[in-house]
């Protein structure tokens, strides 16, 4: 290696390979908006099934609210119904009581991300999805920009990424569902036709209903995780993550069935 060229090669290596990665992901099977645990699980199972999937998260560190456990006590709880997913991701766990298992939140989040990428998913951090591509009354892709551009209020146009299916995994805010309903005057598959808004905490009901609410909420647009709770008006559940994991797997299964 020419030592006088290493500085240039460092920059060129980053720029050229990143450009190639972005170009490869301009036309997707599935675009996942939001980098929380439900979306990451979906990315893993979709990629494992051979679908072309990319996940977009506005934060520098994807993982949603899983990193901090509860009130920065970095432990999380998962019920037995979701333990098979924990095992598939090779996460260490310990039985705490009947039906409940505890694990380290940092290990758990890291494992989800690692496994998703190694299954073939691409994760783009520092990306905000500000809109969707809406063609022939079908959600057909996402409109992306750098997070700092939006935070600074800079007038910079975004880029478009096409996708056969889009997953709203944006958590409590259910941003994609709100945007699609507000801007296009359409009816979502909810009791009101719009985002209902999540209810206050109830662990049992919240865990059941987040999975029940995971579905195609509008042609081309799917919803999972806390976004599913917010859209359908079901309770939040706090730092128990079985429902999040099961929701991610369910939305992946629905899309795999549709596209495969």
Label each residue range with its predicted role.
Residues 85, 90-169:
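Feature captures the FAD/FMN-dependent oxidoreductase FAD-binding
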Residues 231-259:
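A conserved FAD-binding loop/helix module that cradles the flavin
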Residues 47-67:
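Glycine-rich FAD pyrophosphate-binding loop
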Residues 168-184:
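Flavin (primarily FAD) binding-site architecture
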Residues 1-29, 195, 199-203, 227-232:
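Extreme N-terminal leader/targeting segments of oxidoreductases
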Residues 68-92:
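N-terminal glycine-rich dinucleotide-binding loop that anchors FAD/FMN and/or NAD(P) in oxidoreductases
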Residues 25-54, 244, 251-252, 256:
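N-terminal Rossmann-like FAD-binding beta1-loop-alpha1 element of flavoenzymes
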